Amino acid sequence: MIADLSLDADVAEQTQQTLGADSNFAQRHPLQIAVCLRQLVAGQDFVTVEFGGRQIVTQILDVDSRNARFVFDAGSVADDNDALPSARQLTFRSLPGGIRTEFTTFDATPTQFDGLPAFEAPLPTVLHYVQRREFFRVQTPVLDPYIASGRYADGGSFRLELLDLSLGGIALKTADERFGSLERGTVLRDVALQLGGFGMLRLDLEIVAPRQVSTAKGDRRFVIGCKFVATPGPAERTLQRVVTQLETRRQALTPRR
């Protein structure tokens, strides 16, 4: 039987106080949580587990999204491994590639994985996945690209393909020379983002990272990193679905080690 994934009220409050402002970066969709944990598996990243004044260093070994559970390696100290199953809560922390991943779960049970001691636990209901310099980004489709369209301040129009996407912003790629003169801090108002089957969003974009690149043929292109000035709730939920689906597709195409 899958253990109850609901957070006790006092534990939820403690977790919220600990993470504070980072709550804006919380992942709550079970599929996205599973994707984040699978990235720890693929990267063989070390994870610290804290419980009852103890700590072990482990790795996530397997993620079962269908049954909402995951498996992690046993620690190197027998006493800690013996104490872990009776812990009221387990706090996991990792820093893969500068991205802070943190979550809390409960009721770990001893198991075996590939014939070696391990633990199994329910997927967390909330996972905080925070990249210090920018949100976690996914590449957008190449064959059926997403499109950003709008108008310059002088009234001229633009229509550009998205290079990547995150909950915090987008990157645009273009040969349009007008984008070469746009400075950091420029705001593009009411930009329409055509996101394939997810529909269209209208958001204001602030240019934060403009740069030039050269193609293999030596042609000049402009890559414009933009952040969303604001993301209303419905827009953020749509972006979450897009990021989840794109990353899930990418993971499905990545060979498992």
Curated annotation (Swiss-Prot):
UniProt KW Lyase keyword: no
Primary localisation category: other
BP terms from Gene Ontology: bacterial-type flagellum-dependent cell motility; regulation of bacterial-type flagellum-dependent cell motility by regulation of motor speed
Keywords (A to Z) from UniProt: Bacterial flagellum, c-di-GMP, Nucleotide-binding
SUPFAM superfamilies recorded: PilZ domain-like
Gene3D superfamilies in alphabetical order: Electron Transport, Fmn-binding Protein, Chain A, predicted glycosyltransferase like domains
Domain PilZ per the UniProt entry, residue ranges: 131-244
GO cellular component terms attached to this protein's record: bacterial-type flagellum basal body
Localization, UniProt: Bacterial flagellum basal body
InterPro entries membership: PilZ_domain (IPR009875), Split_barrel_FMN-bd (IPR012349), T3SS_YcgR (IPR023787), T3SS_YcgR_PilZN (IPR009926)
Key word Nucleotide-binding present: yes
GO molecular function: cyclic-di-GMP binding
Function: Acts as a flagellar brake, regulating swimming and swarming in a bis-(3'-5') cyclic diguanylic acid (c-di-GMP)-dependent manner. Binds 1 c-di-GMP dimer per subunit. Increasing levels of c-di-GMP lead to decreased motility.
Assembly mode: Monomer. Interacts with the flagellar basal bodies.
Family the entry assigns: Belongs to the YcgR family.
HAMAP family: YcgR (MF_01457)
Annotated protein name in UniProt: Flagellar brake protein YcgR 2
